[in-house]
Every structure is written in structure tokens, then in C-alpha cells.
């Protein structure tokens, strides 16, 4: 039921916020008119209740918070638009995307048909918009399912030509509108086709589109459609890069229809299998949610999501094709908007491979010449150089080949060329910073000699001793070692010991002004004095004056106030707005004191600036042999806390996933069992092993309501890059907030803000663990919650000698009982390096075989769900099943009884009637939706004269 207060709500035209007419009676005519426009243009079926209008109003109010104002917009990029009344451009942050999609989903489920489009990123799924223009006298639909299949088959062949697509990713969604629409004297029909699990750049989609048009002409797949437009305009090129893509369920305007999914093809051995079965409820909430997500052109969040190129594809050949396409567009004089469109597109969309300036290219070539023979001999460092060069500029292939020749015994030109092509499949994080770092390590003398020319020029510029000139000199010397992450908050990082370390107010850089630059200028002064003694009278005076002037410069360099000014200037030069966003974002790197372990490559190596690592295990990586005493002690400990071998293997595999920041399991792990069972000690060992990558979380984050997004959340802000996150044991009365649990495990971007700092956005990398002796209450019964939960029992018991009974001392300990090692806490820190080696071993197994949950885990999880199912508990206490279908109880009567029952059996707030209705609708087969009642069930208090009462909860049939 909708309350009277809800019915009085409207949308303000100025703020878009929901207001109450009882408190805002002076609504202007303008706002009233705007509300009418909004409601009239966003259509809804007449049968829907007034309450459902609020679903649209809530969505609109949310979007208005992120509206980009001004005729020419603002500096904020536009992520979404409304292409019809009430119109508007919006910038919806990544961390608000989930909330936006939930509100949008609610509006679509409620029957609304908005006009919302989303704009493209620099990468995204393959999307195709086919627009068939037909004469006015041909108003029917001419394309058939054969046409659709031909389109998909042709495009599949093109995709396989260019991309290495797995079978599971080769899914094609086809969406159609209800019927052709008459517009400007022509009928417009069409198809929307999406490949949601393939990620590409717009540049490659241009090449694919060009090939598709050629094949479509060759095979005449549209010959039965009386087209008035040519094939170039049938396949809209704008949808690849600039034209807004309609969100699923939206439409262009009130005279058009939304596109709805009609086919879902999976390509297996070049055969198309349609997984849409006639009669499927494609408009259920679950399906709508799925389609909204899969049809979004903004569904990918990183260049790492790019689908790799197929074997043998030459990126240079793709780039050459793009240049021809660009020339073709520029020469197309028939389209007056072509040049404008090309300008809007920008050159970067027509470049498939990276290219830098000539100056940077020459610099890169000179740096590679300084690399050592050892770097060319070791496969991994050799390959790392290749990845770095290919990520900087495609023209550096010959330089990699020349570098490879430093190890003649391993050099193969063909292998270099093949790997180079593969390197372009996916970009890396490597930049010029890595080249500089390698060169400075391999040949420091020649490296500093190479930089000397530029530095000498800056030293001469610095003779005026201004803040800016000195800052330029300082940053040129250390530009790849120091980064300013925030000018406002004075956050600086220094690359030291294989990782980035935050330095307070750039104090180490500040010290270099007095320690290094003073020496640079003192050396320059000595040179000038020496030259002055060997010059003629005129030049002698000039050299002498310059040398004297350096004395003033040195004095400034030792002045605290001057140094503060230099550091402020340095911040402007060294500021990297993306530094904090990229920090600790590589899921496959683990930082040690002596280097970095690359999980993807399976090697230990030196760290480099482009690794962007700040977190560290805080000890050196050492390979330990399995025969070592440490390994034996660790295995002995593990055998006691998990005597069952399958459970022990599972635990080790699970903990090994904490090495990686990927969250493919999307699980929330509950470690449970009576006290003194070893689970806390196991987590303590993991803490020592992971170091900075392990950080506990306050249980209140899981049990209390979430604070507003604007308030500080330091308990979340310091979890960026963390790999394992245990929660304290909850109180007996605590309930788990499943919303937060889903956020931590769902892979969505979250927002957090440390005290007095700007908000940060990141995807959680950590695996969440809840340690508890007694399982807490979880009232949610949705499958999304229980799919994530995994209950891991710890069945052992550790007994102290001082607490043992006489029977234990005399007859020995029972099964799964062990004597407690009172010195274990002192031993655990010494096991960290051995345990790390053990986890790395199991991580390699995990990458091959995945994580398989044992029966014991599944069994305890199912039992936990039954225990938490408050509705099943209530039905078992209050209802009995009868064979008479005329017998039953309404949901509202059932709810009234449940409220009283709940007060007697539980603490906290009773679930609402909507949750109860949802439960019986989906879990009880005798629910009558039209009557809103549960048939074949009566209250136990009722007396059935026919003797049909069944007082047995086991006879209640539960679906799902």
C-alpha cells in the first residue's frame, strides 16, 4: 500500500529532489509543468499503481545530483544523457554506478520507459546498431530470423579473425523493437546486437565494421529489405565511439519503442545455439537486471579487460587499415558532417598502437643501449624489456631485437617478432620510468652521463635562483623516483627498495636541495673559477661573475623558506592525478623487502616504479626447501587444526587465493567452531605472512547501518590493495548486514575517505573472513547472499595441560583433541617465509584447478541457511499443511501472526510484509498470487474436523 505522504511527492524542476507538497505548497508553475512533462514522456502502463510513479521520480532525483550544468557543460566528463524530455547531461561516478543501476532497474520493472543513454569509454563491448530505412509504403518488418543469424555469423567470423575469444565469451545478444516506426516519411526498423563479454577499443571496431559492410554486400544478406539507405548508414558508425547507447529498456523518444532481447546466441564449433526459449519470462526482475548489465557500453573498468588479439594478427596492419578508413571518411564529400565527426572522434581513436614524440622515441632508444647482457640473458627480464618497449611505441621493435642480440645463444629474430605482436594484445603498465630505472641500475655511469647534458642546461637556467628553475632541475634529476599524489594535502611518494613509500611533506626531496644541488652548483662554481683563469680578459670577467653569482644560489639552496617554495613548485611539476588510483592496483604482484613476486609470470624479480606497489610483506623473499624444519613444523600445525586431508587442502588453497587481488570466487568465508580450535592462530600466521597486505576490519562495518557517502570512512580507506581482511567476532545479538557483504565480494568499485582527505575509489581485492564461535544471524534469504557465504568448520580442540581432566591425562585425548602449544605465538613469526612458499605452491595449483569446496563446507553452509531462515522457522511453528485447496491464510493475516511470534523468539526488527510475501511467492508452491494467500495451510491453533492436520514441518514443500 502507498501512504498518503508518498502520493503527494513530486519532482522539483530545479533540484530534481523529491519534495512533499504538504511542506512546499508554493510550487511554481514552471516546476509543475516540468513534472507533467517528465511523467507524460516517461510512459507507464495504465494498470500500474500510483506508487510506481515514485520509482521514476527516485531515479530522476538521483540523476539530478550529478547533472552537468551550463550550456557548454563543465570539466566533468559526461557519462549519461537523457535524449528526450526532461533532457540533460550527467556525470555519474563509478562508485555510484551500482546504486544508479538499481534505481534504473526499479523504474524499468515498474513499467517505465525512460530515454537514458550512456556514453562510451575508450574501451568497451562490441555493439552494433543496424538501422533499416524503408519507404512509407513498406511499413511491415522485412528482416527475418535468417537475416539475424546471417548477421551474427558474419560478425562472429570477423571477431575470430582479430580476437582470441574463449567459447564462454562468445555470447551474442540480439534485441528488437516492437515494430517499425514512421519517422520523417520513412519507416525505421533495426537491430541492436551486443557482445557483452568481449572488450575492444573503438579503433578495432572501426576495422570490423568496414569488413562487415564488405561481407554484407558480398553475400547480399539484406537484399530482401527494401532499403532507402546504403549499407554504410545501415551500420551506424557513431555508435562505436560518440553516439549515446540506449540503456536496456530505454527508448529514443515517446514515439519510439525500446529494444528488448529476442535472441541469445552461443557459438559452439561455428554453430549458433539460441538459448532464449519461447515462453521464457524475459521481463522478470532477474532477467532485466542481467540485461541492463550485459547491454551496458560502460561495463568494463580497465584496459586490462581488453580481449587479446588472435594469434598472427599484426597490430601494424590494423593501424594501416585505420589510416585508410580515416582517409575515406575525410574524402567523403557527400556527408557535410564528416569532417566535424572526424574532429570529434580524434586521432587517438584511429591509432591502434601507441606512438610517442620523436624526442621521447630517441630517448627510449638511447636508454635501451645501456641495458646489461645479464638482462638480455634472463628470459623474464628480457621479456619485461620487450613489454615495456612495445607499450611505449611500436617503432621500438628493432631496438628490442638489437638488445636481444646481446645474448647470441638465445637470439631468434622470428621469436622477437612473434612475441612483439602478442605483446600488443594487452597493454602493460610499463612506461619510460621503467626504462630509466633499468638503465640507472645496469650502467649508472653512462646513464648519468647521458642525463648530464640536460641537467647542465638546467643548472645554467637555475643561476637566477628562482623557485621554478630550481624545481625543474630537481625534478629532472629525480622525476621517476618522486611523485606528488596530492598538491592540496601535500602527499608525496618516493620509490625506494622496490616500492613506493609515502614521505611526509616530501622531506627527503627537500633534503636533496641542500645535499645534492648544493654540490652540483659548487662543482659548477669550481669549473667556472678554473675556466676564468684560462680565459681572455672579457670572458674571464664573465666567468668570474657567474662563479660569484653561484655563491648567492648556494646560499638560497640552504635557506629553509626558499626550499619550501621550491617544493611547492616541484608539486606542480611532479603531480600525477592518477597516482593514488593506480597505487597497489596490480592484482598479481606481492612486494617484499628484496623485490617483487609476479604471480602471473610465476617469478621473483626486482621491483620497478611502474609496478606501483606501496604495500609490503616486510620481510625478504627466500625460497625454502620442503625438507626444511620450518615446513615440517607448519605441516604439523595444519594437520592438527584440520585433521581431515580434504579440508586441509581446501584451507591451504583458499588462503593461497589471498596472495592475489582477484576476487573471482566472490565468496565470504565464515570460520567457525568452538573456542581453542586453532582458527585464530591460523589467521595470525596469515597476518605475519602477508604483512601490509593483511588488515583486520571492525565488525561494526558488517553489523551497523552504512554511514552517508560524504562522511569519512577511514576503516575502508586503508583497505585499498589489501588481500586478506578478517572481521572480529560479532556479539550474540548482532545481525550481518548482507548489503556490505555483497559490496565486499561483488567486485564493484567502492568509495572511501580517510580523515581530512579526498574520497578514493577502488575495487576491493581482499578476501573477507569472519571468525566466530557462534554463527551470527543473517535474515536475508536471497540466493545472492547464500551463494557467497561459505561456512568453514574447525572441529579440533586444543587443551592446555593445566585445564585437562584426570581422564584426559590418564587415558589420553579424544579424537580431534590435541595438547595446546603454549609457545606457538612465539613460533608463528618465524614461519612466515616458509608459509609464503607453501601458499605460492598452492596458488599455482589453484590457477590450474580452481577452488573446490568440500562436502563438509557445503553441509555446514546449508545448515547455517536453515538456521537463519526466519520464515521457515515461523511457518514450521505456526502452520500445518492440509489437502484442502480451499483452506488457506492471507499473507497479511500471516504477517500479523508473524509479528507476535517474532517478538517472542527474536530480537531486533521483524522482517516486513513485503519480504514475507516474496518468500512465500518464490519458496511455497501453494501460494495464490491473485488472492495473495497461502493455500493448503492453516494455523496450528485451528481445529480441522476432517482430521487433515499434519503437524510435521518435514512435509512442507519448499521450492528453490
From Swiss-Prot:
Keywords for the protein's UniProt record, in alphabetical order: ATP-binding, Helicase, Hydrolase, Nucleotide-binding
Keyword Nucleotide-binding applies: yes
Residues annotated as domain SF3 helicase: 646-807
Compositionally biased region (Low complexity): 12-25
Region (Disordered): 1-32
EC number: 3.6.4.-
MF terms (GO), sorted A to Z: ATP binding; helicase activity; hydrolase activity, acting on acid anhydrides
Keyword flag ATP-binding: yes
InterPro entries: AEP_C962R, Helicase_put_C_phage/plasmid, Helicase_SF3_DNA-vir, NrS-1_pol-like_helicase, P-loop_NTPase, Phage/plasmid_primase_P4_C, PriCT_2, Viral_Helicase-Primase_Cplx
Protein name (record): Putative helicase L207/L206
Provenance organism: Acanthamoeba polyphaga mimivirus (APMV)
Taxonomy of the source species: Viruses, Varidnaviria, Bamfordvirae, Nucleocytoviricota, Megaviricetes
Amino acid at each position: 500500500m502507498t501512504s498518503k505522504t508518498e502520493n503527494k511527492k513530486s519532482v522539483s524542476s530545479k533540484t530534481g529532489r523529491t519534495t512533499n507538497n504538504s511542506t512546499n505548497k508554493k510550487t511554481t508553475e514552471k516546476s509543475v509543468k516540468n513534472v507533467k512533462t517528465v511523467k507524460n514522456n516517461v510512459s507507464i502502463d495504465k494498470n500500474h499503481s500510483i506508487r510506481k510513479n515514485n520509482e521514476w521520480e527516485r531515479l530522476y532525483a538521483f540523476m539530478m545530483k550529478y547533472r552537468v550544468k551550463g550550456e557548454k557543460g563543465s570539466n566533468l566528463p559526461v557519462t549519461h544523457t537523457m535524449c528526450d524530455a526532461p533532457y540533460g547531461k550527467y556525470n555519474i561516478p563509478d562508485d555510484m554506478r551500482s546504486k544508479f543501476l538499481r534505481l534504473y532497474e526499479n523504474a524499468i520493472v515498474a513499467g517505465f520507459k525512460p530515454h537514458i543513454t550512456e556514453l562510451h569509454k575508450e574501451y568497451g563491448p562490441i555493439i552494433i546498431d543496424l538501422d533499416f530505412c524503408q519507404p512509407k509504403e513498406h511499413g511491415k518488418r522485412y528482416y527475418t530470423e535468417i537475416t539475424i543469424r546471417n548477421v551474427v555469423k558474419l560478425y562472429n567470423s570477423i571477431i575470430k579473425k582479430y580476437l582470441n575469444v574463449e567459447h564462454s565469451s562468445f555470447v551474442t545478444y540480439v534485441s528488437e523493437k516492437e515494430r517499425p516506426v514512421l519517422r520523417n516519411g520513412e519507416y525505421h526498423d533495426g537491430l541492436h546486437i551486443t557482445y557483452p563479454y568481449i572488450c575492444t577499443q573503438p579503433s578495432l571496431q572501426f576495422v570490423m565494421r568496414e569488413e562487415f559492410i564488405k561481407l554484407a554486400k558480398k553475400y547480399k544478406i539484406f537484399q530482401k529489405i527494401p532499403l532507402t539507405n546504403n549499407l554504410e548508414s545501415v551500420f551506424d558508425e557513431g555508435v562505436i565511439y560518440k553516439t549515446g547507447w540506449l540503456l536496456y529498456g530505454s527508448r529514443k523518444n515517446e514515439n519510439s519503442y525500446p529494444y528488448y532481447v529476442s535472441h541469445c546466441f552461443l557459438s559452439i564449433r561455428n554453430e549458433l545455439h539460441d538459448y532464449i526459449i519461447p515462453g521464457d519470462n524475459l521481463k522478470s526482475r532477474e532477467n532485466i537486471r542481467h540485461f541492463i548489465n550485459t547491454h551496458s557500453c560502460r561495463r568494463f573498468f580497465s584496459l586490462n579487460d581488453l580481449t587479446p588479439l588472435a594469434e598472427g594478427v599484426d597490430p601494424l596492419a590494423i593501424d594501416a587499415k585505420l589510416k585508410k578508413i580515416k582517409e575515406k571518411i575525410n574524402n567523403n564529400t557527400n556527408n557535410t558532417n564528416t569532417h566535424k565527426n572526424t574532429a570529434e572522434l580524434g586521432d587517438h581513436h584511429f591509432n591502434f598502437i601507441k606512438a610517442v614524440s620523436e624526442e621521447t622515441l630517441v630517448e627510449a632508444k638511447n636508454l635501451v643501449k645501456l641495458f646489461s647482457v645479464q638482462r638480455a640473458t634472463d628470459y623474464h627480464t628480457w621479456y619485461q624489456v620487450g613489454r615495456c618497449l612495445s607499450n611505449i611505441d611500436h617503432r621500438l621493435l628493432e631496438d628490442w631485437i638489437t638488445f636481444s642480440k646481446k645474448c647470441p645463444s638465445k637470439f631468434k629474430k622470428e621469436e622477437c617478432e612473434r612475441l612483439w605482436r602478442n605483446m600488443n594484445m594487452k597493454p602493460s603498465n610499463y612506461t619510460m620510468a621503467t626504462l630509466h630505472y633499468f638503465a640507472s641500475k645496469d650502467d649508472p655511469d653512462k646513464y648519468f652521463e647521458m642525463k648530464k647534458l640536460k641537467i647542465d642546461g638546467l643548472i645554467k637556467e637555475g643561476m637566477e635562483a628562482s623557485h621554478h628553475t630550481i624545481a625543474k632541475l630537481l625534478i629532472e634529476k629525480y622525476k621517476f623516483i618522486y611523485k606528488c599524489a596530492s598538491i592540496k594535502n601535500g602527499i608525496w611518494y618516493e620509490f625506494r627498495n622496490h616500492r613506493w613509500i609515502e614521505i611526509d611533506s616530501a622531506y627527503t626531496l627537500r633534503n636533496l636541495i641542500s645535499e645534492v644541488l648544493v654540490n652540483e652548483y659548487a662543482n659548477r662554481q669550481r669549473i667556472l673559477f678554473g675556466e676564468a683563469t684560462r680565459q681572455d680578459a672579457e670572458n674571464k670577467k664573465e666567468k668570474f661573475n657567474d662563479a660569484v653569482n653561484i655563491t648567492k644560489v648556494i646560499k638560497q639552496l640552504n635557506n629553509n623558506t626558499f626550499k619550501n617554495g621550491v617544493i611547492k613548485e616541484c608539486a606542480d611539476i611532479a603531480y600525477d592525478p592518477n597516482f593514488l588510483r593506480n597505487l597497489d592496483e596490480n592484482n598479481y604482484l606481492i612486494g617484499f623487502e628484496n623485490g617483487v613476486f609476479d604471480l602471473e609470470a610465476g617469478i621473483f624479480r626486482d621491483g620497478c616504479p611502474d609496478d606501483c606497489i606501496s604495500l609490503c610483506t616486510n620481510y625478504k623473499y627466500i625460497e625454502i626447501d620442503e625438507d626444511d624444519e620450518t615446513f615440517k613444523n607448519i605441516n604439523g600445525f595444519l594437520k592438527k587444526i584440520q585433521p581431515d586431508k580434504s579440508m586441509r587442502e581446501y584451507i591451504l588453497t583458499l588462503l593461497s587465493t589471498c596472495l592475489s587481488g582477484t576476487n573471482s570466487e566472490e565468496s565470504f568465508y565464515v570460520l567457525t567452531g568452538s573456542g581453542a580450535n586453532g582458527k585464530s592462530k591460523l589467521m595470525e600466521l596469515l597476518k605475519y605472512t602477508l604483512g601490509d597486505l593483511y588488515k583486520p576490519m571492525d565488525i561494526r562495518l558488517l553489523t551497523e547501518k552504512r554511514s552517508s557517502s560524504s562522511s569519512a570512512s577511514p576503516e575502508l580507506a586503508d583497505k585499498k590493495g589489501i588481500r586478506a581482511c578478517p572481521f572480529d567476532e560479532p556479539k550474540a545479538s548482532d545481525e550481518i548486514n548482507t548489503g556490505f557483504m555483497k559490496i565486499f565480494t561483488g567486485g564493484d568499485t567502492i568509495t572511501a575517505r580517510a580523515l581530512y582527505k579526498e574520497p578514493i575509489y577502488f575495487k576491493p581485492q581482499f578476501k573477507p573472513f569472519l571468525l566466530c564461535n557462534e554463527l551470527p544471524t543473517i535474515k536475508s534469504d536471497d540466493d545472492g547472499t547464500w551463494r557467497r557465504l561459505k561456512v568453514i568448520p574447525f572441529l579440533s580442540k586444543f587443551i592446555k595441560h593445566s585445564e585437562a581432566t584426570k581422564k584426559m591425562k590418564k587415558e589420553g585425548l579424544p579424537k580431534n583433541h590435541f595438547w595446546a602449544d603454549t609457545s606457538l605465538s612465539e613460533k608463528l613469526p618465524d614461519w612466515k617465509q616458509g608459509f609464503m612458499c607453501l601458499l605460492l605452491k598452492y596458488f599455482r595449483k589453484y590457477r590450474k584447478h580452481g577452488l573446490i569446496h568440500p562436502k563438509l563446507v557445503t553441509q555446514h553452509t546449508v545448515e547455517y541457511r536453515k538456521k537463519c531462515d526466519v520464515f521457515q522457522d515461523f511457518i514450521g511453528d505456526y502452520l500445518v499443511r492440509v489437502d484442502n485447496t480451499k483452506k488457506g491464510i492471507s499473507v497479511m493475516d500471516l504477517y500479523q501472526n508473524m509479528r507476535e511470534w517474532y517478538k517472542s523468539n527474536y530480537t531486533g526488527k521483524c522482517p516486513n510484509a513485503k519480504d514475507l510475501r516474496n518468500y512465500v511467492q518464490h519458496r511455497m508452491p501453494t501460494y495464490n498470487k491473485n488472492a495473495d494467500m497461502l493455500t493448503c495451510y492453516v494455523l496450528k491453533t485451528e481445529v480441522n474436523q476432517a482430521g487433515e492436520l499434519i503437524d510435521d514441518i518435514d512435509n512442507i514443500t519448499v521450492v528453490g
